[in-house]
Structures are given as structure tokens and as C-alpha cells.
Amino acid sequence: MALDGSSGGGSNVETLLIVAIVVVIMAIMLYYFWWMPRQQQKKCSKAEECTCTNGSCSLKTS
């Protein structure tokens, strides 16, 4: 991808594409690292079924 603007209007589309990709990656990371642990925390009812690391608890996978 050439970002020097030599392709005329194409560089604008490339910039928008890069921004869109970054936003999607951030949304996925937010989902996995914030939303998923919160959902698992709710399901974790019994202490023996839970595993806690760094203050975030979730159901044991095994």
C-alpha cells in the first residue's frame, strides 16, 4: 500500500481502510478482554468452578 498520495484519490480510500481495520481490531480486543471476562464472571457461581487471575474470575475451562 502506497501512502504517498501518488495514486490520486486512492490514498484517501486506503487511509479510511486502515482506520476501519484499526477500529475493528480495537473492537475485537475490547470484546475479548473486557466483555468476555464480564460475561464469564456472571456465570461463575460456585467458588470451586472458578479460576481467578489478576482479579478477573472466570469458569474453569477443564
Swiss-Prot record:
The keyword Cytoplasm does not apply. It comes from the Viruses. It is a single-pass membrane protein. The chain crosses the membrane at residues 16-36. Not glycosylated. One of its GO terms (cellular component) is virion membrane. Belongs to the asfivirus inner membrane protein p12 family. Homomultimer; disulfide-linked. This is Inner membrane protein p12.
